[in-house]
Amino acid sequence: MASGAYNPYIEIIEQPRQRGMRFRYKCEGRSAGSIPGEHSTDNNRTYPSIQIMNYYGKGKVRITLVTKNDPYKPHPHDLVGKDCRDGYYEAEFGQERRPLFFQNLGIRCVKKKEVKEAIITRIKAGINPFNVPEKQLNDIEDCDLNVVRLCFQVFLPDEHGNLTTALPPVVSNPIYDNRAPNTAELRICRVNKNCGSVRGGDEIFLLCDKVQKDDIEVRFVLNDWEAKGIFSQADVHRQVAIVFKTPPYCKAITEPVTVKMQLRRPSDQEVSESMDFRYLPDEKDTYGNKAKKQKTTLLFQKLCQDHVETGFRHVDQDGLELLTSGDPPTLASQSAGITVNFPERPRPGLLGSIGEGRYFKKEPNLFSHDAVVREMPTGVSSQAESYYPSPGPISSGLSHHASMAPLPSSSWSSVAHPTPRSGNTNPLSSFSTRTLPSNSQGIPPFLRIPVGNDLNASNACIYNNADDIVGMEASSMPSADLYGISDPNMLSNCSVNMMTTSSDSMGETDNPRLLSMNLENPSCNSVLDPRDLRQLHQMSSSSMSAGANSNTTVFVSQSDAFEGSDFSCADNSMINESGPSNSTNPNSHGFVQDSQYSGIGSMQNEQLSDSFPYEFFQV
């Protein structure tokens, strides 16, 4: 019996969870599960529970399903589980059970065509907790099949001990079927980005559980501020994806601000769990300082790149202006007439150092390839292979000078003249042997070497070289005067071999740098006097330019041929084997090197003669 001064009543201690549970059909053949409590978690599961207040004793409890809206009518869905029959739960409890827990209750839904039959069954069983008129019970049009409520009824014993005294029924919160989009739990599964500009307008792709496109919105909330994402019904894809644009924030910010983003259903004001969204400050550069910095940086990099790669300093229409030190320019820059500035690089030298920088003006060849008569001495035909390329046309800017004094032979042994282009890898006799007509004009005077018939001595050993190309005229003298020896016969059967070092660049051709001079016959060394060496360089240019015979002249067009070359002076036996001399024959044999010449600074004879020991023979 009831105890206390107050009437007993029912109080729900634990409400059922409203969302997250799926209603099962009978045909699915599986249990409908258990209705969890409102505060249930994975680690601490709870279930709906009630407590009878102001009463201690035994009784009976009945649980049925009713509709969502008032008046609460019996619902066609069934309640299934332990102690359930005909779609409702009923069980007695004793005095020791307080409170009452219901952990084996499930909801099984019926098909739409079975709704009316299920309602009639409830009426026959007397399941009408709120005594709704039968006429209203038969009206099933307003019945929502996706939402139910639990109705708790308690019966206490009467005077005769029968459990007939009913306490006022109590209904729980609505329970929604998780399959229905209009009642399902709202949940944000994933977004493609969780930050955006404070000005809004960022496009976001949001994945979610099933929603209704006409009953859903995206809400941004922070304290008292609220805004909605911008999208239309066409932006809801198959009820599981929403594409929207973020709304602008309420004010300008200087630091990121985090707000809450959530889904909300307007029909029942249901909201999802919130997700953080961060508004970023506007990074717009009002004065364009960032663009200016980028432009300045790019311009500076371009200037540095142009200076390093090209090094262009000045363009001269007359030719190529180039520092003597450094690597030579490319072929493309030479042909375009472009001036290239290379950094100065010191070079060691035996006879002096190169100045701060000199300018070389590129000039064409003196002689054309057609002007050279292709005839070779019979004795050296195997040694005179073509080596240098054919020269191009050249202006006749050099004056014609008289021929030198006649020399004893018209044929000379082949002498190798390696240049920087040849890499100094050719043998001693790997140069071309060519002749030039006697009436050739514009031959450099310092390169003329006459060949005559009046010097036919068999013991004559002839050698000629230039030690100051710019400051002197053509050099020619008899063999006796050439060597500064009173008796020319002392040089008979004396083979002379002179070696020079090759120059590294075109700009250093004025440094002969003679290394050795070997007179193979010991008798030659015995008659040479150091004073004779100095006498050789003190000869006047007027005496060296004597001679009027315009015989065929053997020449070398480039002064650097004397540098980096191996000179060999043949004795009388080799000179005689080359054939008879003919001073009037325009096809007289000689050797020639086809190239271009460069203007070269002069070198004092005093420095040249004093730079070597007395046993070296300088010419």
Curated annotation (Swiss-Prot):
One of its GO terms (molecular function) is DNA-binding transcription factor activity. This is Proto-oncogene c-Rel. SUPFAM superfamilies: E set domains, p53-like transcription factors. The keyword Nucleus applies. Residues 399-420 have a biased composition (Low complexity). Its main location: nucleus. One of its GO terms (biological process) is innate immune response. The lineage of its organism: Eukaryota, Metazoa, Chordata, Craniata, Vertebrata. The keyword rRNA processing does not apply. One of its GO terms (cellular component) is nucleoplasm. It is found in: Nucleus. Pfam families: RHD_dimer (PF16179), RHD_DNA_bind (PF00554). The modification N-acetylalanine is found at residue 2. Proto-oncogene that may play a role in differentiation and lymphopoiesis. NF-kappa-B is a pleiotropic transcription factor which is present in almost all cell types and is involved in many biological processed such as inflammation, immunity, differentiation, cell growth, tumorigenesis and apoptosis. NF-kappa-B is a homo- or heterodimeric complex formed by the Rel-like domain-containing proteins RELA/p65, RELB, NFKB1/p105, NFKB1/p50, REL and NFKB2/p52. Residues 421-437 have a biased composition (Polar residues). Residues 399-437, 572-593 are annotated as: Disordered. A motif (Nuclear localization signal) lies at residues 290-295. Residues 8-297 form the RHD domain. The gene is REL. Component of the NF-kappa-B p65-c-Rel complex. Component of the NF-kappa-B p50-c-Rel complex. Component of the NF-kappa-B p52-c-Rel complex. Homodimer; component of the NF-kappa-B c-Rel-c-Rel complex. Interacts with NKIRAS1. Interacts with NFKBIB. Interacts with NFKBIE. PANTHER family: NUCLEAR FACTOR NF-KAPPA-B PROTEIN, PROTO-ONCOGENE C-REL. It is linked to Immunodeficiency 92: An autosomal recessive disorder characterized by recurrent bacterial, viral, fungal, or parasitic infections appearing in infancy or early childhood. Patient lymphocytes show defects in both T- and B-cell proliferation, cytokine secretion, and overall function, and there is also evidence of dysfunction of NK, certain antigen-presenting cells, and myeloid subsets. The modification Phosphoserine is found at residues 267, 503. Keywords: Acetylation, Activator, DNA-binding, Nucleus, Phosphoprotein, Proto-oncogene, Transcription, Transcription regulation. InterPro entries: Ig-like_fold (IPR013783), Ig_E-set (IPR014756), IPT_dom (IPR002909), IPT_NFkappaB (IPR033926), NFkB/Dor (IPR000451), p53-like_TF_DNA-bd_sf (IPR008967), RHD-n_c-Rel (IPR042845), RHD_CS (IPR030492).
